[in-house]
Amino acid sequence: MSRGRLLAILIGGGALVAAAFAAVVIATAGSSSSDELVLYSARSHYGEEEPFERFAADTGTDLRLRGGSASELYERLSSEGGNTPADVLITVDAANLWRAKEAGLLEPVSSAALDERVPEDLRDPDGAWYGLTLRARTIMRSAERVGPDEVTTYEGLGDPHWKGRLCLRSGTSEYNVSFVADRLAKDGRAETERMLRRWMANEPEILGSDTDVLEAIADGDCDVGLTNHYYLEREREEDSDFPVEAVWADQAGRGTHVNLSGLGVVRGSDNKQEATELIEFLVAPEQQRVFQQNNHEFQVAECCEFKRDPIDVAAAGARLDEAITLMDEVGWD
């Protein structure tokens, strides 16, 4: 069987995506196959090209990847309509999957393999999208100044004990918006607003990224924060003694909030069968282990060492606008 190619094309601000895949171009070039799948991907993680390269090699299918932010790719698909060359959309955050389905950008597929490999709450009930990887958004603490049991719940970040000691990423972060939308869907407006106002009463330092939050904790600028778990693992790759620890929040309650990256077949694709086969390949156990090893995300089928809060993508998606409004009202800029 001929060996497929993985080609990288940059759209807009997706430089990290292109950079991550650039090393694959030469290594897998040279296929004579006429089969090709076009992938629009918002994932920007280093070292994740291996599963795609394996698929290209195993099937002889060329993979043409076009990177950009989730919003850029959504707008591009919307503007291209039925003329889009895309076969598969790979995006981050459950909210973006929900939005793509609501806009009619995804084509439902039926696959016994996908239904078996992807848990029910991590796939669309109509088959429009499927979870690819999971990431926990949880509490981070200073390993030097905060004990493991000092804060164990999201609500606990609002304790006055943490006044002037809390760091948060900007409220414009899609990860934070999705977190709040999920709380609104599960806890209601009053309870969610009460929690956020208590957080804001602690006068948190607002920073630009999850990495900034972790480094602020390590440097002593704050003692606790909220980030996606894999950012901590990236820091530990650079410094095995990085002085920050994750706290798996709400283990005595619903469990730790998790979000997902996911993917679906683009509506109107002429390669629906091949696109479905790619998705099946990526959620198979061997490739899931590669994603976990290379980027420290969790597998969809075998997630976590902790109790995770189940995801209701549709319920949270319906509260996204309300989440943005509420965060603005409480001053989470």
Question: Where are the regions that the model predicts?
Answer:
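Ligand-binding "clamshell"
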Residues: 100-108, 120-127, 235-249
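A bilobed periplasmic-binding-protein/Venus flytrap-type ligand-binding module shared by bacterial periplasmic
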Residues: 138-145, 181, 185, 258-274, ...
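A structural signal for short loop-to-beta-strand junctions that line the ligand-binding cleft
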Residues: 84-89, 107-139, 155, 165-168
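Short beta-strand->loop
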Residues: 40-43, 125-129, 141-143, 149, ...
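Ligand-binding pocket segment of bilobal, Venus flytrap-like solute-binding proteins
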Residues: 171, 175-178, 182-249
